[in-house]
């Protein structure tokens, strides 16, 4: 019940407030023209520059997106080129390493060959030296034996052997 009282008092208040409202046509036309004028001014001074600014901003953003896509594509292309150069460099490095190994083996083989030749020469020289030393040793031994034989013959014969023919004969006997 109290609810009905409040509701009717609210209705009465609304009717009082809006009941006296009537349309004032000159004021309505003036307000309408003012609204059109304000909308036109806002459109010309705010909306169109704002729209133009947003369009420019959109173009700027789109250009940046396009440029970043182009830059990304260029970066990918450069990355591919760099990867290809790295692969090529690796292959080239492997070829250089293989060539170095072959050169090393060639140098080692040449060194071994030269060393073997030098060793053969040294051995040959040593053999010649040994043969020469042995011949000198044999000659010295023969000389000592001849001298000893002459001394023994002197003692046996009891006289000195001065005759060159006798000395030659003794030497020939010892040599054979």
From Swiss-Prot:
Metal-binding among keywords: no
Signal peptide range in chain numbering: none
One cellular component term from this protein's GO annotations in UniProt: plasma membrane
Record keywords, A-Z: ATP synthesis, Cell membrane, CF(0), Hydrogen ion transport, Ion transport, Membrane, Transmembrane, Transmembrane helix, Transport
Topological relation to the membrane, as annotated: Single-pass membrane protein
TM helices/strands, residue ranges: 27-47
First-listed, main subcellular location of the protein, grouped into a coarse class: membrane
Pfam short name (any one): ATP-synt_B
Domain of life: Bacteria
Gene Ontology MF annotations: proton-transporting ATP synthase activity, rotational mechanism; proton-transporting ATPase activity, rotational mechanism
Protein's cellular compartments: Cell membrane
Function: F(1)F(0) ATP synthase produces ATP from ADP in the presence of a proton or sodium gradient. F-type ATPases consist of two structural domains, F(1) containing the extramembraneous catalytic core and F(0) containing the membrane proton channel, linked together by a central stalk and a peripheral stalk. During catalysis, ATP synthesis in the catalytic domain of F(1) is coupled via a rotary mechanism of the central stalk subunits to proton translocation. Component of the F(0) channel, it forms part of the peripheral stalk, linking F(1) to F(0).
Subunit structure: F-type ATPases have 2 components, F(1) - the catalytic core - and F(0) - the membrane proton channel. F(1) has five subunits: alpha(3), beta(3), gamma(1), delta(1), epsilon(1). F(0) has three main subunits: a(1), b(2) and c(10-14). The alpha and beta chains form an alternating ring which encloses part of the gamma chain. F(1) is attached to F(0) by a central stalk formed by the gamma and epsilon chains, while a peripheral stalk is formed by the delta and b chains.
Family of this protein: Belongs to the ATPase B chain family.
Protein name as annotated: ATP synthase subunit b
Species in which this protein is naturally found: Metamycoplasma arthritidis (strain 158L3-1)
The encoding gene: atpF
